[in-house]
Structures are given as structure tokens and as C-alpha cells.
Amino acid sequence: MEEEVVTKRSAITVKIGLNANNLPLEMHWSAEDGKIENAPAKAMMLSLWNPEDNNTMKIDLWTKDMSVEEMKQFFHQTLLTMADTFEKATGENLISEDLRDYCYHFAEKMDIMPEK
């Protein structure tokens, strides 16, 4: 079997504006392949798998002006997309549905259920 080789490199960048206490005041991100340049953001959760240590490295940041309501929505949507990603990556649909059920419970408890 032939070994695959890297034929292209791409970059996603995040720029964080900090205050004197190193608290994020602003965030902008760019993705060259997605044709996104300097798009504003209020929060990010970056997780990277370190294969040498079998460990997840994380960076979680949010701007000072992000409201609690926005954070609740951000977490809810992130958890839902994690269920989708897990199912796509592993084919484990039953546990992914369990996670989606939890997301429904989370939304109820946080009082962020979409109106019907």
C-alpha cells in the first residue's frame, strides 16, 4: 500500500485582543480555504489530540462582553455538533443519540429551548 503524502497545507488563524489583565476583549478568525477573513467571534473552544501523550490539549476563551445567555447557547450548540462529529467519526449512532438527548435536557435546564 502506498503511503499518502501531504499535497497541500492550509491555515486557520485566531487573533485575540487582550486587556492589561490578559482577558480577551475581542476575537477574530480567518480560514484561507473557507474564504473567511477577520470574522468576529466572542468565544472559542479548541481541542487538539496529542498522540504522544494520549491526551487532549484545550484552549477555551471568551470575550469579556459575552453574555451568560450567549454562553448557554454556545455550549448547547457545541455539544450538539460534538454528537454529530462523534457519530460521523465512529459510526456510534446510539451513544450519539444519547448525547443529543442530553443536549435537549441541557437546553431545558438552561431555559434556551427554541420556541415552537
Q: What does each model-identified segment do?
A:
Residues 7, 25-91:
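Active-site- and interface-proximal helix/loop "cap" or "latch" segments in soluble metabolic
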Residues 1-14:
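Structured beta-strand/loop patches that form or line metal/cofactor-binding pockets in enzymes
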Residues 22, 67-72, 102-110:
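Short amphipathic alpha-helical patches
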Residues 12-31:
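Active-site and channel-lining beta-strand-loop segments
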